[in-house]
């Protein structure tokens, strides 16, 4: 009987482990701007956040070691409002491996400045999927689902929808909280509008472009550089289509911020015709950075 119980316990551990490895996140908490505070408390918070992100079961899928979501979460605290209330920002970076290479492409590089939460030393990080109980864990869970969704979109057309819906559910549960970043009327570039854009059919071409750019473009370049580059150029036309229908979306800005330098590098080696075509598209959808794209023509 004891042997049977041991076997069952081992199987349970293996099952839990196999379902808890979706995310491989680097998590840091910086509190250098907060004076007169026990630094151990923030080290404890950093460890708790690390375990929350990396050990929690986020999906119903088994992820292989090489399939885990590579991301960075940096929480920088800038102000202590009261004994247990803090303000700060979240630096969020999502990376995706490119097929047959050691190269990781950046899919999201964003700073959320609407960060405010309550935390006491030793307090457990509580998160309930169907209710709002803690702003810090809700924000972190929100971005984990955004990470999962963007990653899924890059491997399967519109494959991230279930995860974006999870993130949107967190937004809905947060509508009665006083902390910023969750409501439509606060500004047009916050957590509310990010999931709104991701699930809005009008912006679907952006998500389709993510798939074409990564799965049919970058992932192909090891075997056939020209075909991969051509497919990436085609993916940019989907961005152009979305921008013409509804310009200035938050999602478009975030995506271009993560891809701008990479696009310039990729097409610096393209044909003159492709270079001109890409530069014209990018200047149209990202006019504030038009001079940067002109560098493609000089290469």
Residue locations for each model-derived region?
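Sec-exported extracytoplasmic/periplasmic mature domains
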Residues: 50-58, 149-153, 264, 268
């Amino acid at each position: 009987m004891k042997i049977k119980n041991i076997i069952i316990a081992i199987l349970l551990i293996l099952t839990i482990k196999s379902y808890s490895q979706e995310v491989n996140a680097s998590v840091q908490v910086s509190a250098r701007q907060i004076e007169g505070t026990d630094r151990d408390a923030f080290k404890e918070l950093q460890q708790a956040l690390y375990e929350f992100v990396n050990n929690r079961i986020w999906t119903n899928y088994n992820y292989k070691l090489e399939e885990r979501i590579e991301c960075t979460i940096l929480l920088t605290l800038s102000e202590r409002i009261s004994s247990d209330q803090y303000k700060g920002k979240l630096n969020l970076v999502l990376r995706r491996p490119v097929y047959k290479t050691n190269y990781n492409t950046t899919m999201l590089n964003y700073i959320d400045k609407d960060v405010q939460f309550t935390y006491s030393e030793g307090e457990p990080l509580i998160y309930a999927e169907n209710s709002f109980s803690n702003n810090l864990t809700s924000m972190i869970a929100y971005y984990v689902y955004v990470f999962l969704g963007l990653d899924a979109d890059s491997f399967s057309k519109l494959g991230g929808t279930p995860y974006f819906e999870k993130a949107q559910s967190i937004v809905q549960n947060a509508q009665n909280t006083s902390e910023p970043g969750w409501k439509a009327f606060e500004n047009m570039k916050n957590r509310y509008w990010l999931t709104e854009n991701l699930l809005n059919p009008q912006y679907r071409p952006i998500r389709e472009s993510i798939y074409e750019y990564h799965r049919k473009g970058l992932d192909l370049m090891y075997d056939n550089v020209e075909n991969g580059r051509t497919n990436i150029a085609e993916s940019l036309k989907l961005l152009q289509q979305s921008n013409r229908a509804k310009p200035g979306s938050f999602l478009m800005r975030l995506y271009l911020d993560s891809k701008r330098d990479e696009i310039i590098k990729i097409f610096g080696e393209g044909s003159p015709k492709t270079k001109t075509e890409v530069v014209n598209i990018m200047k149209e959808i990202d006019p504030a950075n038009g001079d940067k794209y002109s560098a493609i023509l000089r290469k």
